[in-house]
């Protein structure tokens, strides 16, 4: 039987149990405990588009806060930056980082490869600053050679890519449905089928 906890019980400053309801019947129960450990998963369902389980609604964070706990470093949420926002049938499905690793290009509504504008100074030495250099890296790596140039900015860390996409959307350069475009069509169907079969199957 599974329960959803709605509140923590306290005596003074000490947590002594919780109140929860059964997920199927909705019956309310109170539990007393000598100690309570919150292990409740993430908070991804706080965002309208995500690939996380429906359960990841931040309940554990809220329970702790309501009970008087101090929450720290709440801004440090790791996002996987690419997922589907349209059409509705695939909304929230993750698009693997392999798509970018195989040469996927992030563009905005104006057709610009905007990631070149978001390379942090600390990563500038490792990432290409021209389309030509970026494309050369892809050609070398996907053909099994050692790269002789810097990697594409689409392969920056997840936090940088997620913030860049969000910045483009907020600036009015996002897709019609609130995202960005990830294009790998230049690799051709045969290469996509070989290297990214699951992505092809999900989104063909």
Locations of the language-model features?
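Acidic, metal-coordinating catalytic segment for phosphate/diphosphate chemistry
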Residues: 64
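Flavin (primarily FAD) binding-site architecture
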Residues: 38-52
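Core beta-strand elements of the Rossmann-like FAD/NAD(P) dinucleotide-binding domain
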Residues: 24-35
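An anion/pyrophosphate-binding glycine-rich loop and adjacent beta-alpha core
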Residues: 69-203
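Short, well-ordered coil/turn residues at beta-beta hairpins
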Residues: 33, 39-40, 109
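Short, acidic, Ser/Thr-enriched surface-loop or helix-capping motifs
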Residues: 10, 23, 108-109
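A conserved short coil-to-beta-strand element within the FAD-binding core of flavoproteins
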Residues: 1-14
């Amino acid at each position: 039987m599974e329960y959803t906890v709605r509140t923590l019980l306290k005596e003074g400053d000490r947590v002594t149990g919780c109140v929860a309801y059964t997920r199927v019947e909705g019956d309310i129960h109170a539990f007393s405990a000598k100690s309570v450990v919150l292990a409740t998963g993430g908070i991804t369902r706080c965002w309208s588009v995500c690939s996380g389980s429906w359960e990841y609604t931040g309940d554990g964070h809220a329970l702790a806060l309501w009970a008087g706990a101090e929450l720290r470093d709440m801004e440090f949420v790791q996002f996987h930056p690419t997922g589907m926002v349209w059409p509705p049938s695939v909304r929230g499905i993750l698009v693997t980082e392999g798509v970018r690793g195989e040469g996927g290009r992030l563009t905005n509504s104006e057709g610009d490869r905007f990631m070149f504008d978001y390379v942090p100074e600390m990563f500038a030495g490792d990432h290409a600053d021209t389309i030509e250099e970026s494309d050369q890296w892809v050609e070398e790596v996907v053909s099994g050679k050692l790269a002789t140039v810097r990697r594409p900015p689409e392969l920056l860390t997840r936090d940088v890519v997620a913030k860049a996409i969000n910045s483009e959307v907020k600036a009015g350069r996002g897709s019609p449905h609130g995202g960005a475009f990830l294009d790998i069509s230049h690799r051709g169907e045969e290469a996509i089928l070989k290297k990214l079969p699951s992505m092809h199957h999900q989104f063909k």
